[in-house]
């Protein structure tokens, strides 16, 4: 090695050492770029050094976390206690990102998405604060985004037209339509991105329960997201005043994380903050209601869950306070106490509340909430009958009493501490975002973030208290053995959605009558609204052609043409193919195995999710699930079994399906981990007298949350259902994890509850799956990620494990290569206030030359067509085009969309738009940058080698695709738009939402527990019983 190379290596190593060397930072009291150091601390167990500073001129708080991690993070948060339920913090979060003094373009936030290599960009409205974080590995990118974020939050333009677009407005559905000239009141509706987002949110019964619970226990803290009933009371003037009052450095907290220099950050941030004087900081901490005088009870109406029994429409929970979150050790201890009571099938709360049949699943607020100043422990149940609702609180209190009497086993506590040790060792790609999420909420509520980061200090103090005996029990006695609690109940009401619609109608009529008074007649009032809508459309369309030269951007030329190689090694162990990734893992080994099934019968495929749930629930002949859960926590970081589905990168429509098994542990515990995993898969006791009840309980858990799980990601469900009609591969995927799977599970539950014979048949099929689930065959493959020094020992362990596996192949079906007819125009009638859409078309395999241009096309359509047409003009929360290069699918989706018919028109015009547009070099470069955000994003060490192992995509394939992507031209984009979107093969579309008259020519289906109503995949349903 040359002398200058040695010097270079020494300097790099020295820089790394100094990065987390606490002495390399200014002393407490010293100043740097207008900031004064308040505190600094080295945290060796997290390999970081934290420095807390205060800006001299404004008193802005600043926390820097230095760590040898190239994925650097910035976040700025403001205390935003909501004054009412109009959603002003939420609407401000949206409009803040719509233009600023230095960057006066419309929507610089979304415009920066494709001008950056960030792997995380977002904004969050929390209960009492609003945060704007990003993460990137590129220093220039960091400085670009930091400049945009600082100007957006501290110098926003907050134009009234942006408020109307993002918040709420009243206007005709389509101001350009000829009938809009007639001025009919029924054609006028409420619009706005946030308004429609929150209408979508209250379609999610879990969200609605949680937010109404929060309003009851924290009435001093209004709904920050906004209630549609009150959003329409907010004015632009109120928004601007709220921003001036709250978005000030004196009311802010700044956080930076990673390996970039603190001094550089402070200079850039300080230059902006120096333009402000000292302002008012909102230091008020909102507290929950006073329960010192005894119990409180609140009951509110909610929607009916069509996937639950008609006589089990109650959701009820009870909440207790557990001290003060500034007591960091006690709050940590309360977290352990909560886990001991609630975590796992063997936990006392699960057994007393769900296994007993009192309800079907925990309420969404169940657990310990430490986001405010007062920690709150809530326990509750959904799917409860009116008669049983009062018994839930009694059952919870009995668990407290029994736990206090029996005490907590040391084995369970040690298992929890072992999980913490593994969490410290596990190298994640998004550690910095995790640091921000862990500290920011409590920081705004007066908790010192330095104490939150001092992991070992907290754990060691907990251990000291715990070793004295009876510590956790004393916390129970202190906080839970009393009746100072809130019981919150939501009752399913058949007219709930109709009442919301009626309330909206009344609000609309009131707004219109005010406009009639102002303009003299209804016709003139609606004409005025139409003119406003047309002006907004004009502004939106002008923005699509605006000069974006003021925005900073990275260059595609800065992206390396060479993909970073993370080499894998392949070997045969006992005739089984094994992929090895040897990397620094902090003494952990990660294991993954795939067992592929060829021509699997359809009825067994539909049962795979239930099988996976069962092996983690039923226990074995010699151990209960509680005992297994304790062992898993003591010996591993977790084990799992799940279905998999992967597509071939070289042949369209070719796929593999089967079961995958995974887990990780300390190197020394890998033999135990493999034995645990194998025993659970092969020896779960389906013949136990308790098995039938447990299986019904698992089916109820899934069906009870089905409507809410769809509402949370309806566009994905819509897309999967649409794609099911394109090929057998996508049809299989829909059976595994789509709406077909949800309906099949509901059918299974109905049959299990009404027919003991069908339940017995179901159990026999689960036993059949168990016989071939994990077996040593030519279809079994393994991946191991570990330290190079651990590979040999892991190979010895693996060989012994493989030798003990059974050798049974999965059954096949003669009909398995066929697929049932699936509609190419499906409409799922669901009780949501907004719509979700998915349009799918099959394209080419990953290695085809059109694959990379299709990905560029998807980015171009998202940012230049779908976002402005469907989100900005149409009011949907989101819209996107996406290319699945390995699956060979091109998709268009919308999310929380009030205007699905307009969206479908936009979708249908997408191909012609993309074909006829003369794409500029800037647009192409931005599209490529957007793709590289994902391609080059850091990955956690356990994911390394996974892409090759799962799908067979080699480094060489990825390298070729990368080069093709960098070389895509405008002509390439025009050509793939013509070939696939305009002239392409059959497209398939699916909508989810409330059925209207215009849906008559669609294939309308309904998901339901009721056999007479369920129309989704009826053929599949009959095969599952």
Curated annotation (Swiss-Prot):
Q: What InterPro entries does its record include?
A: Metalloenz_LuxS/M16, Pept_M16_N, Peptidase_M16_C, Peptidase_M16C_assoc, PreP_C
- Which enzyme class? hydrolase
Which keywords label this protein? Hydrolase, Metal-binding, Metalloprotease, Mitochondrion, Protease, Zinc
Q: Where is the active site?
A: 93 (proton acceptor), 166
Cofactor annotation remark: Binds 1 zinc ion per subunit.
Cofactors required:
Zn(2+)
List the EC numbers from the record: 3.4.24.-
GO term, biological process aspect, one: proteolysis involved in protein catabolic process
Q: Does the UniProt entry include the keyword Protease?
A: yes
Give binding positions for Zn(2+): 90, 94, 197
Q: What are the recorded GO MF terms, alphabetically?
A: ATP-dependent peptidase activity; metalloendopeptidase activity; zinc ion binding
Bridged cysteine pairs (disulfide): none
Cellular component GO terms, alphabetical: mitochondrial intermembrane space; mitochondrial matrix
Q: Which Gene3D superfamilies match?
A: Metalloenzyme, LuxS/M16 peptidase-like
Where in or outside the cell is it found? Mitochondrion intermembrane space; Mitochondrion matrix
The family this protein is said to belong to: Belongs to the peptidase M16 family. PreP subfamily.
Oligomeric and partner information: Monomer and homodimer; homodimerization is induced by binding of the substrate.
Q: What role is this protein assigned?
A: Degrades mitochondrial transit peptides after their cleavage in the intermembrane space or in the matrix, and presequence peptides; clearance of these peptides is required to keep the presequence processing machinery running. Preferentially cleaves the N-terminal side of paired basic amino acid residues. Also degrades other unstructured peptides. May function as an ATP-dependent peptidase as opposed to a metalloendopeptidase.
Name this polypeptide is given = Presequence protease, mitochondrial
Origin species, per record, is: Aspergillus oryzae (strain ATCC 42149 / RIB 40) (Yellow koji mold)
């Amino acid at each position: 090695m040359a002398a200058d190379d040695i010097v270079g290596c020494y300097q790099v190593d020295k820089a790394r050492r100094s990065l987390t060397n606490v002495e390399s930072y200014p002393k407490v009291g010293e100043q740097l770029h207008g900031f004064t150091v308040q505190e600094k601390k080295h945290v060796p167990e997290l390999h970081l050094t934290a420095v807390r500073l205060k800006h001299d001129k404004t008193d802005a708080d600043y926390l820097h976390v230095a760590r040898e991690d190239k994925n650097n993070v910035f976040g700025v948060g403001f205390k935003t206690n909501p004054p009412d339920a109009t959603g002003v913090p939420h609407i401000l979060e949206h409009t803040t990102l719509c233009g600023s003094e230095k960057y006066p373009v419309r929507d610089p936030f979304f415009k920066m998405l494709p001008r950056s290599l960030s792997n995380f960009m977002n904004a969050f409205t929390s209960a009492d604060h609003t945060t704007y974080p990003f993460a990137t590995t590129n220093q220039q990118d960091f400085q670009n985004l930091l400049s945009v974020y600082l100007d957006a939050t501290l110098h926003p333009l907050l134009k009234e037209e942006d408020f109307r677009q993002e918040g709420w407005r009243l206007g005709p559905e389509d101001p350009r339509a000829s009938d809009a000239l007639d001025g009919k009141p029924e054609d006028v509706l409420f619009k706005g991105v946030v308004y429609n987002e929150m209408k979508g949110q209250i379609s999610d019964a879990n969200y609605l329960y949680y937010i109404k619970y929060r309003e009851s226990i924290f009435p001093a803290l209004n709904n920050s997201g906004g209630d549609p009933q009150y959003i329409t009371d907010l004015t632009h003037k109120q928004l601007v005043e709220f921003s001036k009052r709250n978005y000030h450095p004196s009311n802010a907290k700044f956080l930076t994380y990673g390996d970039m220099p603190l001094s550089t950050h402070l200079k850039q941030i300080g230059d902006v903050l120096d333009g402000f004087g000292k302002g008012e900081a909102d230091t008020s901490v909102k507290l929950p209601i006073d329960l010192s005088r005894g119990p409180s009870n609140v009951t509110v109406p909610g929607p009916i869950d069509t996937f639950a029994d008609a006589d089990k429409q109650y959701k009820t929970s009870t909440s207790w306070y557990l001290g003060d979150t500034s007591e960091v050790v006690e709050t940590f201890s309360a977290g352990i106490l909560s886990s001991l009571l609630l975590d796992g099938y063997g936990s006392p709360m699960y057994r007393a509340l769900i296994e007993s049949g009192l309800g079907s699943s925990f309420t969404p607020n169940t657990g310990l909430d430490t986001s405010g100043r007062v920690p709150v422990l809530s326990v509750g149940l959904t799917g409860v009958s009116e008669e049983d609702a009062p018994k839930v609180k009694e059952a919870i209190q009995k668990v407290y009493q029994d736990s206090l009497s029996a005490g907590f086993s040391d084995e369970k506590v040690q298992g929890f501490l072992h999980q913490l040790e593994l969490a410290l060792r596990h190298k994640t790609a998004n550690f910095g975002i995790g640091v921000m999420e862990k500290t920011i909420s409590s920081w705004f509520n007066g908790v010192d973030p330095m104490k939150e980061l001092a992991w070992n200090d907290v754990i060691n103090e907990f251990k000291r208290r715990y070793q004295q005996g009876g510590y956790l029990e004393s916390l129970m006695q202190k906080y839970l053995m009393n009746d100072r609690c809130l019981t919150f109940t939501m009752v399913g009401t058949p007219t709930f959605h109709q009442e919301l619609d009626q309330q909206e109608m009344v609000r609309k009529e009131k707004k219109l009558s005010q406009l009639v008074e102002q303009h003299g007649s209804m016709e003139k009032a609606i004409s005025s609204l139409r003119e406003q809508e047309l002006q907004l459309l004009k502004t939106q369309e002008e923005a699509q052609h605006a000069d974006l030269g003021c925005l900073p951007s990275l260059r595609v030329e800065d992206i390396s043409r060479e993909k970073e190689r993370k080499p894998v090694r392949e070997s045969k162990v006992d005739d089984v193919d094994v992929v090895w990734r040897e990397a620094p893992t902090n003494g952990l080994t990660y294991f993954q195995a795939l067992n592929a099934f060829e021509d699997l019968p359809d009825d067994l495929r539909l049962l795979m999710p239930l099988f996976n749930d069962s092996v983690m629930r039923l226990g074995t002949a010699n151990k209960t699930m509680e005992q297994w859960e304790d062992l898993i926590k003591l010996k591993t970081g977790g084990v799992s079994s799940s279905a998999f589905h992967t597509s071939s990168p070289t042949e369209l429509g070719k796929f593999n399906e089967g079961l995958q098994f995974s887990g990780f542990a300390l190197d020394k515990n890998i033999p135990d981990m493999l034995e645990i995993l194998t025993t659970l898969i092969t020896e779960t006791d389906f013949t136990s007298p308790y098995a039938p009840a447990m299986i019904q309980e698992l089916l109820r858990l899934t069906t009870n949350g089905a409507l809410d799980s769809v509402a949370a990601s309806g566009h994905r469900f819509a897309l999967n259902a649409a794609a099911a009609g394109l090929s057998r591969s996508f049809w299989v995927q829909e059976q595994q994890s789509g709406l077909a799977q949800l309906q099949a599970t509901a059918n299974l539950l109905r049959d299990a509850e009404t027919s003991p014979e069908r339940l017995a048949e179901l159990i026999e099929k689960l036993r059949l799956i168990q016989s071939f689930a994990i077996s040593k065959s030519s279809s079994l493959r393994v991946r191991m990620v570990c330290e190079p020094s651990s590979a040999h020992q892991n190979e010895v362990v693996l060989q012994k494990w493989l030798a003990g596996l059974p050798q049974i192949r999965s059954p096949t079906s003669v009909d398995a290569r066929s697929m049932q007819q699936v509609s190419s125009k499906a409409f799922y009638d669901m009780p949501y206030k907004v719509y979700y859409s998915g349009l799918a078309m099959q394209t080419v395999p990953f290695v085809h030359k059109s694959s990379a241009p299709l990905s560029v096309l998807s980015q171009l359509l998202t940012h230049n067509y779908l976002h402005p047409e469907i989100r900005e003009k149409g009011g949907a929360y989101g819209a996107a085009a996406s290319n699945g290069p390995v699956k060979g699918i091109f998709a268009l989706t919308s999310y929380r969309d009030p205007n699905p018919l307009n969206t479908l028109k936009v979708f249908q015009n997408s191909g012609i738009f993309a074909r006829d547009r003369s794409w500029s070099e800037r647009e192409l470069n931005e599209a490529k940058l957007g793709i590289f955000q994902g391609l080059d994003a850091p990955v956690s060490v356990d994911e390394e080698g996974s892409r090759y192992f799962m799908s067979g995509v080699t480094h060489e394939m990825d390298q070729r695709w990368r080069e093709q992507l960098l070389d895509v031209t405008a002509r390439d984009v025009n050509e793939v738009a013509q070939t696939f979107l305009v002239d392409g093969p059959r497209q398939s579309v699916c909508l989810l939402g409330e059925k209207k008259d215009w849906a008559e020519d669609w294939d309308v289906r309904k998901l339901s527990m009721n056999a007479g109503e369920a129309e989704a995949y009826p053929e599949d349903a009959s095969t599952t019983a």
